[in-house]
């Protein structure tokens, strides 16, 4: 089920891979006050679907609560080694940032179940911007440097924002998609 809060709007459609990016009656969201919602059916478990909301017939927006976006301006800068098999942007069908929906995602299985954090007065915190911490600008490259930080006495890492934001040069404090981790990392 998709839900969009859109106060003072008259109607909303969802357009995407599942309906050839065409606003159709079956894909008009039902209104409940300032919320619009729809339950999609017939989606293939595990397949990614790009989509946007079409608001009042003229405003195309991505879902602000999506966990992944496709960006026509910045995705081209992402190396395939950093993000293999990145879903291509639907060029010619959409404009601007689009959301990605995937049903049946596998839940993350935490590997460390007995984590004990250091006492508050014993914390040595390293504030890390993934983009600037290593030449590769990736989570994997940062992970390879954890032993180095440990040898410095660091016992806690505070990640600066890692979610998607407008543009590609920022500390990430201008977020636009709070639940979508920046694919550049």
Where are these regions (language model features)?
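Basic K/R-rich, polyanion-interacting modules in nucleoproteins and related proteins
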Residues: 1-12, 61-122
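Aromatic-rich carbohydrate-binding modules that target alpha-glucans
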Residues: 3-48, 56-79
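Solvent-exposed loop/turn segments at secondary-structure junctions
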Residues: 20, 131-134, 163-166
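Short, solvent-exposed loop/turn and secondary-structure capping segments
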Residues: 25, 62-66, 136-141, 161, ...
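Conserved, mostly hydrophobic/aromatic
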Residues: 53, 128, 149, 159, ...
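An acidic-aromatic substrate-binding cleft motif
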Residues: 102-156
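Glycine-rich, aromatic-flanked loop segments that form ligand/cofactor-binding clefts
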Residues: 152-166
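Aromatic- and acidic-residue-enriched carbohydrate-binding clefts of CAZyme catalytic domains
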Residues: 165-185
């Amino acid at each position: 089920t998709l839900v969009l809060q859109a106060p003072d709007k008259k109607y909303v459609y969802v357009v995407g891979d599942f309906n050839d990016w065409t606003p159709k009656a079956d894909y008009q969201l039902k209104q409940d006050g300032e919320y619009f919602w729809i339950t999609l059916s017939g989606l293939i478990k595990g397949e990614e679907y790009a989509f946007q909301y079409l608001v009042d017939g003229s405003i195309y927006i991505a879902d602000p609560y999506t966990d992944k976006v496709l960006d026509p301006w910045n995705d081209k800068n992402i190396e395939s080694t950093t993000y293999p098999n990145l879903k291509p942007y639907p060029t010619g069908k959409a404009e601007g940032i689009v959301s990605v929906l995937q049903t049946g995602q596998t839940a993350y299985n935490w590997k460390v179940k007995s984590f004990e954090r250091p006492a508050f007065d014993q914390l040595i915190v390293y504030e890390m911007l993934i983009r600037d911490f290593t030449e590769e600008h990736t989570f994997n490259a940062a992970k390879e440097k954890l032993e180095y930080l440990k040898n410095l006495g660091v016992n806690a890492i505070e990640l600066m924002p890692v979610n998607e934001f407008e543009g590609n040069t920022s500390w990430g404090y201008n977020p636009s998609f709070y639940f979508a981790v920046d694919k550049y990392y």
